[in-house]
Amino acid sequence: MNIVVLVKQVPAISDIEIAKDNNLVRVGAPSMLNPVDKHAIEAAVAVKDAIGGTVTILTMGNALAGEMMRDGIAIGADKGVLVSDERMAGSDTLATGLVLAKAIEKLGGADLVFTGKRSTDGDTGQIPPAIAQRLGMALISYANSVSVDGTTVTATRLNHDGIETVQAQLP
């Protein structure tokens, strides 16, 4: 089972500074692993421990993202891949989704892709559906728990009526 976890380097929550134009000050600001991405890594590692496979952390960013990726490896991921190019600095979610999907393809594809719900710095939540669409994969969003049995992924998530169980076939 080849599992990819998308992670993001975000400004440290305790040190967020807002510029006069209402954008986050990123230059020189301390950064950290997006907190909800930690849960995605933990879920991916739990699946790997249950059925075997490899967990690869994938991120797009500058060289400083390497430190953040070490945190993910400490949680239990097997390796990390950083996609970095100055031409991608400040890219929007459309470009980011395309680059990350192409990176997953270059890595040989993925049986499962885990992400956090959204990043603390952008809060758009657009990357998971963009990746699923580009890779032709099913998307199970807002999962609280995940399990894999044979060729089926089962997840539970909260909805307006309580707890919902959803399933999707592995590629």
Annotated model-derived regions:
Residues M1-P171:
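N-terminal glycine-rich FAD/FM-binding segment characteristic of electron-transfer flavoproteins
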